């Protein structure tokens, strides 16, 4: 009988254990944290997470994880710390049985009862923000998302900030969306109480703010007077009590009770809490409480309090400490640094500029919002909807110009009716007046259109460059991965080729549009367009040739590469055929016919011979000059030098508004350098022989002639295109064209990611 009972009890225990495991499965993060606490505690099961609390002048407090109660410092000597590292060390001392790895400031303040001063028996309650002692590996908090609320997260690996900074960031993020912060947590620790990001929940704002009633405030004041006139804490309650909706404005008051008992002044904290509005209208009652009927505070009253705080002058106070702080300067409309003495002062006293601006930003006059699509376009930065916003702005500009012209036309007609009986000379003067008005309007419209187009082209150019640069860096990173993954390399290569193709297609569309609208201008820019396309082609081929470093991967994805290049080649062949029908420069046309051969599959790595030291014929150009980096700088970096040297779009530049991409600007030195590069590579492919001295002489003469031609064009056309800043470089006639081109690019400070990759491979 006893055995049967024991078996039944064991079965029941196993069933309860399985049920418990099933219920706790969705909360793996919390279970893992409790597991870590239980494993490290050694004695008993932890019912609370380890925390410590500090208040200058009082003994440090820590939570007993077995009882959940606050206990004073066991040594009876330690008080507040100055650095987070000291806080971490104290956590490790208080919880030696736990593996404390970091500390983090809590989101909410807590009230600690019977908190005694150091070396005294005065014990009072105190509100304070504790520090959490994090156990083991960092686990982010689990955030609940109520109905009609939204979850967000921010991660910036280049930023490593403390808890207070991210709190300010998420508050601002919620406010910009017309919502208020509900809860938040830290992500990705990068130091002691420092993190790379945060996650947070925003909820709709409410119109009525619940607060402590007047009667409760009076009772609190009476109780505080009985407790030696302790500081008054006005806590405005929220319908969502999980958010730390109480913010401190300053730490600046002297505890008057202790002045009579102690010889020196002891600085304590005067927490003045600021209320953050929360929740949506759906949380209100059917009959919302009327402001003022039960002591509630409205948004208007909160704004009045903020104005009263932020309009105060900065006060150092009577103490002589040196504490850098921030205050809001009403005359300047921004937060300014000042030195706080450590006591006294007023509430216009903040620990950081971000915190100061977050509280006092209501004091800054709002910037007038743009009234039409044109102003909106100029006021906002580029994004994925750049083209659509540009089209709207262009249409708005045309409507504005048309309305102005209609108004002038109407005035002109009315003036003609009234001037029928005037002498001919006066009528002629009237006509000239309105003609001048029309001409001025046309000129103004052309100027506005030019500014709009230049802005659009600059933004598109920047977007194309950024996308290509990111795609190339990802491709190089995939090649450097150990071991290389063919699928990942192919995926990164596709993105890179697609980015290059977008640049190429925009350039082609640009030229085709100019050719249809202004053939003369198209003839002038033809060589520039073809040079730009050649640079794109060479840069892409050189990037593809990097696959030689991992030949077995390249052989595996060879077919996919051929298909990818065939798609790109089809559009290029069509454009080459169309552009060859309107030859402008015989030399350029013949060059392009040689530079763009019919499509053939890309094979950068033939079957490797038995001698692994022998490299494919494709890499012969890399043996010239100063090594691998020259081809890298000459091909991949050629376009980057021109783009990076264009600091801004020239204001005198006239471009049609329908263009979708930049017009590349190459001066004679730039074009000459590229032509020298092509002519220097030619002998390697075609095997014709020229003496090096004759070749150098011809190249120098060509560069001189091209320079004279370009200078003449600049003087005639007043340099309509954006200027490119080139330093004065002494050209050594004994250098090869590749070396001269590399020197020019290095003088401009350019260094591309492929060069770094090849340099690392050599090391």
From Swiss-Prot:
Listed A to Z, the keywords are:
Cell membrane, Copper, Disulfide bond, DNA-binding, Glycoprotein, Membrane, Metal-binding, Nucleus, Phosphoprotein, Protease inhibitor, Proteoglycan, Serine protease inhibitor, Signal, Transmembrane, Transmembrane helix
Which residues make up the binding site for Cu cation? 163, 167, 184
Q: Coordinates of motif NPXY motif in the sequence? A: 750-755
Which Gene3D superfamilies does this UniProt record tie to the protein?
6.10.250.1670, Amyloid precursor protein, E2 domain (1.20.120.770), Amyloidogenic glycoprotein, copper-binding domain (3.30.1490.140), Amyloidogenic glycoprotein, heparin-binding domain (3.90.570.10), Pancreatic trypsin inhibitor Kunitz domain (4.10.410.10), Pleckstrin-homology domain (PH domain)/Phosphotyrosine-binding domain (PTB) (2.30.29.30)
Tissue expression from the record: Expressed in placenta, brain, heart, lung, liver, kidney and endothelial tissues.
Which cellular compartments is it found in?
Cell membrane; Nucleus
Q: Where is this region: Disordered?
A: 211-299
> Membrane topology type, per the record?
Single-pass type I membrane protein
According to the record, the signal peptide region is 1-31
Stretches assigned to the Extracellular side:
32-692
Where is the region Interaction with DAB2? 749-763
GO biological process terms held by the UniProt record: axonogenesis; central nervous system development; G protein-coupled receptor signaling pathway
**Basic and acidic residues: which segments have biased composition?**
270-282
Q: Where is the E2 domain?
A: 373-564
Q: Does the keyword Disulfide bond apply?
A: yes
Q: Which residues lie on this side of the membrane: Cytoplasmic?
A: 717-763
Glycosylated residues, per the record, are 626
Q: Please give the family membership noted in the entry.
A: Belongs to the APP family.
Function per UniProt? May play a role in the regulation of hemostasis. The soluble form may have inhibitory properties towards coagulation factors. May interact with cellular G-protein signaling pathways. May bind to the DNA 5'-GTCACATG-3'(CDEI box). Inhibits trypsin, chymotrypsin, plasmin, factor XIA and plasma and glandular kallikrein. Modulates the Cu/Zn nitric oxide-catalyzed autodegradation of GPC1 heparan sulfate side chains in fibroblasts.
* Protein's name according to its UniProt entry: Amyloid beta precursor like protein 2
Q: What is the lineage of its organism?
A: Eukaryota, Metazoa, Chordata, Craniata, Vertebrata
